[in-house]
Amino acid sequence: TKMFEIEFPLFAFTHCRDVVVAVSKAGGFGVYAAGGLTNEQFEIDLKWIDNEIGGRPYGVDLLIPNKSLAQDEEFDSEKLKAMIPKEYGDFRADILEKHGIDGSDFRSFEQDDERGMGLAKNTKEEGSKNIVDIALSHPISLIVNALGVPPFWLLELAKEKGIKVGAMIGSSKHAIKQAEAGVDLLIASGTEAGGHTGEVSTMVLIPEIFEAIKPYGDIPILAAGGIMNGQQMAAAMAMGAGGAWCGSVWLTTIESELPLVMKEKMIEANSSQTIRSKSRTGKHSRQLVSSWTEAWEAPDALEPLPMPLQTMVTDPPLIKAFKLAEGGHEGAKELVTYWVGQGVGLLKHSISASDVVQEFKEGFIDGYERLHEFMQE
């Protein structure tokens, strides 16, 4: 709270600009995920946030991998498409057709448009620098890299502008590397988390990292992974975290960018209905189980390709499936999936993002008072 002058240390990772604004205005801290956005869309969205947020602090989350296929080469969509074996086109088309969707356009990659390539562009060195330049031209307070140690040039640029740099980590080894690199904030993401995540649970990870980084000074830790309410947040802070970083809890909010069909699937799901798989991006990421994920986990499935090629395989057919699912297509409804953590089982209704923040505050106080009562007895 001191680092960013906020009322409550609840950080909202989200692909929805409305959630960023709502959470920051409610006393938390909104973090906008650039993900696969084009430079133009990212600029438009940050301008909108600047106009709506009323001077409250916010941040951005970027995907800048330290290991990506031909990362230092200029982005060339045709060259990347040519690197994808033809059987991947047939495989994705077959999945669609088994669910009553025409897959003929997806048997080759020639017709794939730029929609599925935002992530591929942004993980190239030139694309990474472009997206960072856009972010730094706005009054952000935090920039987070979600894939490995931030490049030196990013740390230097942020420092010049007085912007804090955070990093996602999934082990104490990663925490030490980030601390040595000079990051200001660590987001310790347990395996319960949605999206790209490691194998260690949040309950184990927080105290382990808390001890591991003591020699490096007072670097705040945000707990991430499975945290869906204020009581869990209080528990994480009792273990050494300075706040909570949450993503899944915003997915079913009224403001969320997700289509209604996806929100309904999440509200109906239990905590066992997620899977950590390489099938979406080429790196392990947790998502809701669906017919699409099951097809990639089958014994006869193809091995996922490295980032960014796997995203280029999966995004175009899933974009089509989402459109059809919104129109009521039953096969498409079975296929659609989205990144979400194991805490999905705690998503029971759709409320506003500001109401989620308020519920977190109340739950945090309840959790704190419960612990205090034990000490009084």
Q: What residues fall within each predicted segment?
A:
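Active-site entrance/lid segments in N-terminal catalytic domains of soluble metabolic enzymes
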Residues: 1-216
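Conserved active-site-proximal phosphate/metal-binding subdomains
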Residues: 77-92, 196-220, 228-377
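Thr-Gly-centered strand-to-loop micro-motif
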Residues: 13, 32, 145, 223-224, ...
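Residue-level detector of alpha-helix initiation sites
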Residues: 149, 227-228
